[in-house]
Structures are given as C-alpha cells and as structure tokens.
C-alpha cells in the first residue's frame, strides 16, 4: 500500500494547462492553471499511478487553440503482474485531436512561424466591451462551420476539466443538427490597443472563454384554432430548417477560463446570448441545461439587473391589502390581488425568460422592495408577525407577511409530493425553515449585487477617464504639431 501511494499522484495537480503565443525565440506563456476535475479522463479518484515527479503539460495556442501534450516524469513504475502505469497518452487521445500528440519542436514551430496575424474568429462579431483598459470581443458562429468545429475539437477537453458531468459535443452529426448549435467565443482583442505585437506574425486575439447554445423546438399551440390532421406527404417536400421554427434557446456549456474569472466576462457573455434571443423572433425563451451553483449566481445577477428597471417602471410590488377585492376572505393566498399577474406575464414574455427563473427573480425583487427594517435581517419582530399576520398596522409588515406566504405557496407546489407525507406541524416547520433559507440566500445575493454595481461603476469611471486622457493626448499632439509648423515657418522667414 505504501509503495502504491509512493507511485501515485493527484491528477489535478499533475495536469498543467498553459495558453501560449509567439515570442521572439519560442512561444511565451500568457497564463497557466490547473483543471478542476480530471475524473472523466483518469477515473473517479482522480489519481494517476505509475510515475514519480509527473507533469502533464497541455499547451494551447492563444488564438486558434492548437493543442499540444508533453508528458515528463522522474521515474516510471516497472509493470508487475496486473500493476502497470496508467497509459496517459491513451487516456488523453479520447479527448484531444491527433495533432495534439505531435513533437514539441513541431508545435513550437507552428506557433512561431504560422502567419496568425490575419486570424479572425469564425462567425460574426456579436459584442465588444472593455475591462480594466483591455478590449474584448464575443464572436458567434454556427457549429456547422468547419472552422468552428476545428476550434471546438481542439478545446473541448476544457468541458471535462471544468464542467462537472459535462459532455463534449459531437461534431460528426448531420449538418441540419449542427446548424441548431451556436458557439460563442470570448477573446481579448489587442488589435485595438496601442501595443507592439511580440512578433510580426502574432495574432491580436487570445482566448478567454466560450459557450455553446442549441435550439429546442417550442410547441406553441393556438387554442383559438381546432387542429386538423393533414393528408400531405411526410417528410414534407419543402426543406424545413430548425432555425426557422419557434424554439427555446438552451445554454449547454458556459466556461470562462480561471485567469479571467471574476472580472465580468461571464455576465457580458450571458447578456450577449440573452440579446440574441431578444433579437430573434423565432426564439421564445432562454433556458439553461443543468446549471451549477456558480452559474446560478451569475444568471441571477444578470437577470436581476435586466428585469429590475422594468419592475420599477411598472411599480411592481405586493399589495398590502388584497382582501379589498374580495367580498369575503378565503383560505387560499389571494395571489391575483397581491400581484399584477398580467403585467408580470407581459414582462416575462417580452424578455423571454423561462417561468421558473422569472418567478425566482420576481420573488427576489419583491423582497428587496420591502425596507430592511421590516425584514428578518433588519431585526423584524417575527413573533409579532406570526400573531398579527396581515392585520399589522404597518403596510410594509403586511407586505413582508404576504411575501413569505407567496414564497411558501411556491415551495409547497414544487415539493407537494414530499410535504403531504408529513404531519401538519412538521409540514409547517419545514416550509418555515425553507423560506428562511431562501430569504437568507436572497440577502446574500443583494450584497453581491451591490458589490457588482460598485465594480461596474468603477470600471465605467475608469473607461471615461481613459477616454478623456486619450482625447487630451490627441489634443496635445495636435497643438504640438501646429506649434512645430509655426516654428518651422518662422525659421524660414528673414530676420529683422
């Protein structure tokens, strides 16, 4: 057992991912980092047996993502019976194209000598933005494009490294299927910056991250019509393209590389995808396929800042006196009197956000509209709330009571099959505890949103300062040029 531990190492530590670009003599490292997961490649325990001092260097050219694998180690275990070293190259071949296993000199020569200066990402430019004085672009292209397939096949191992339970896409499907997919590449765009490239052939682009989306057919029945069967041929003689059918757009993969995380690239990428939905009349909703916790936070932040102005514009808030619309009080939560449901549905449809996510953001916004002193975090008297309920004199206390009731109603509908198996007292306690946890989560998000607002405000001020500085510099150069011309003309004039 001790010998096995001596010859075993952590696969996440052994793999080193490096992004490189050309330099004067040989490729230069732009960034280096380790994977978060390696179990799809090296097994559930994420350990590699059979080597001492193992380093698996996985390099990618910054612009076209050409990969290269280089394995080095101090010692290799000699096979004994069934105990033999892990076949590292064999394991990686399932996740990388054949060109990744060329010799190191061949890879370095390709990076150095390849004329990458004219490289332009495939597809069309969807969005450009600046962060901390650097320029970035987001390009979108169909997966049916051969150049997109080339880039994706080179870089798809990142799905296994960073997206838990993620599956690389198949690029061998029929063209009509591939055409349902869109790939978004996020890249630095140094061609706009006043810096000299490291070599005359170097590209101005460098990978930051990417996302993939696909169209999912949306069945939208017009209930005013009575559907009738047709006797026409099947399949129909005219070509039906997926891009022309009503669809949901689903985000399948979404990745910002570790060196670029936490700086706003994810929000820019998500907002670009969302804008694509708004601009396409055939897309009905934007959905996400199995999001993880970190993506949920990003999505909540983006959607909250998209919807909040609309909620404020329409004065969306909880009606503290819903019973005024009823001749007598009912045992049910009067949702239709508490909220302007028609207006909310119109906002949701206009912004193409799927119902569950919209209800989540709406719930968060309604909590934020209640003053902090009337919420649990601000010291609200919860015992008094349980006694007074909707009869409290303070309308904000009544709003807070109804907010908790609306949230309990949503939670009960979602988990009804589990809750009905509990005793009534246990059911009430479970709902009360869950509402408290939901509220705590929203309060944490409010803090995150405030930090984001401050960061965006600082970035905007920095961009404005940079623009003003550039304008002052241009004006200064113009004045100096005019002065030089005046001095030159004066020097040619005869002296008195």
From Swiss-Prot:
Residues the UniProt record annotates as site (Interaction with histone H4 N-terminus): 181
Residues making up the signal peptide according to the UniProt record: none
Positions of region (Disordered): 456-496
EC number: 2.3.1.48
One Gene Ontology MF term: histone H4 acetyltransferase activity
Catalytic residues as annotated in Swiss-Prot or TrEMBL: 289 (proton donor/acceptor)
Location in the cell: Cytoplasm; Nucleus
InterPro entries in the record: Acyl_CoA_acyltransferase (IPR016181), Hat1_N (IPR019467), Hat1_N_sf (IPR037113), Hist_AcTrfase_B-typ_cat-su (IPR017380)
Presence of the UniProt keyword Signal in the record: no
Record Gene3D superfamilies: 3.40.630.30, Histone acetyl transferase 1 (HAT1), N-terminal domain
Function, in words: Catalytic component of the histone acetylase B (HAT-B) complex. Acetylates 'Lys-12' of histone H4 which is required for telomeric silencing. Has intrinsic substrate specificity that modifies lysine in recognition sequence GXGKXG. Involved in DNA double-strand break repair.
Protein name as annotated: Histone acetyltransferase type B catalytic subunit
Gene label: hat1
């Amino acid at each position: 057992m001790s010998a096995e531990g001596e010859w075993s190492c952590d696969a996440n530590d052994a793999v080193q991912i490096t992004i490189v670009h050309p330099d004067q003599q040989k490729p230069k490292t732009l960034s280096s980092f380790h994977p978060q997961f390696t179990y799809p490649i090296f097994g559930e325990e994420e350990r590699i047996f059979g080597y001492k001092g193992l380093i698996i260097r996985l390099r990618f050219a910054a612009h076209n993502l050409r990969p290269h694998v280089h394995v080095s180690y101090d010692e290799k275990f000699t096979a004994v019976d069934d105990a033999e070293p892990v076949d590292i190259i064999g394991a990686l071949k399932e996740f990388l194209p054949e060109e990744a296993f060329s010799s190191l000199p061949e890879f370095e020569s390709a990076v150095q000598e390849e004329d990458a200066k004219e490289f332009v990402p495939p597809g069309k430019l969807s969005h450009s933005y600046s962060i901390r004085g650097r320029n970035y672009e987001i390009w979108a292209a169909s997966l049916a494009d051969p150049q997109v397939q080339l880039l994706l096949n080179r870089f798809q191992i990142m799905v296994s490294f960073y997206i838990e339970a993620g599956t690389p896409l198949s690029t061998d499907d029929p063209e009509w299927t591939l055409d349902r997919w869109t790939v978004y590449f996020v890249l630095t765009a140094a061609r706009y910056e006043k810096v000299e490239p490291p070599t005359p052939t170097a590209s101005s682009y460098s990978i930051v991250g990417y996302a993939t989306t696909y169209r999912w057919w949306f069945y939208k029945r017009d209930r005013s019509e009575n559907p009738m069967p047709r006797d026409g041929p099947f399949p129909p003689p005219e070509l039906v393209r997926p891009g022309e059918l009503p669809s949901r757009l689903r985000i399948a993969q979404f990745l910002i590389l570790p060196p670029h995380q936490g700086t706003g690239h994810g929000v820019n990428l998500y907002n670009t995808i969302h804008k694509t939905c708004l601009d396409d009349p055939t897309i009905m909703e934007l959905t996400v396929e199995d999001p993880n916790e970190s993506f949920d936070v990003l999505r909540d932040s983006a959607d909250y800042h998209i919807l909040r102005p609309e909620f404020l514009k329409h004065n969306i808030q909880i009606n503290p006196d819903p019973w005024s619309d009823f001749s007598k009080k009912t045992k049910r939560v009067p949702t239709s009197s508490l909220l302007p449901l028609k207006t909310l549905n119109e906002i949701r449809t206009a912004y193409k956000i799927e119902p569950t996510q919209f209800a989540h953001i709406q719930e968060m916004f309604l909590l934020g509209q209640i003053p902090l002193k009337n919420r649990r975090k601000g010291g609200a008297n919860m015992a008094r709330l349980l006694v007074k309920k909707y009869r409290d004199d303070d309308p904000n206390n009544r709003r807070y009571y109804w907010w908790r009731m609306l949230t309990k109603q949503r939670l009960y509908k979602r988990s009804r099959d589990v809750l009905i198996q509990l005793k009534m007292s246990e059911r009430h306690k479970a709902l009360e505890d869950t509402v408290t946890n939901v509220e705590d989560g929203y309060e944490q998000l409010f803090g995150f949103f405030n930090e984001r607002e401050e960061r965006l405000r600082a970035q905007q001020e920095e961009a404005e300062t940079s623009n003003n500085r550039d304008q002052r510099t241009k004006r200064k150069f113009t004045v100096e040029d005019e002065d030089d011309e005046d001095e030159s003309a004066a020097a040619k004039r005869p002296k008195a």
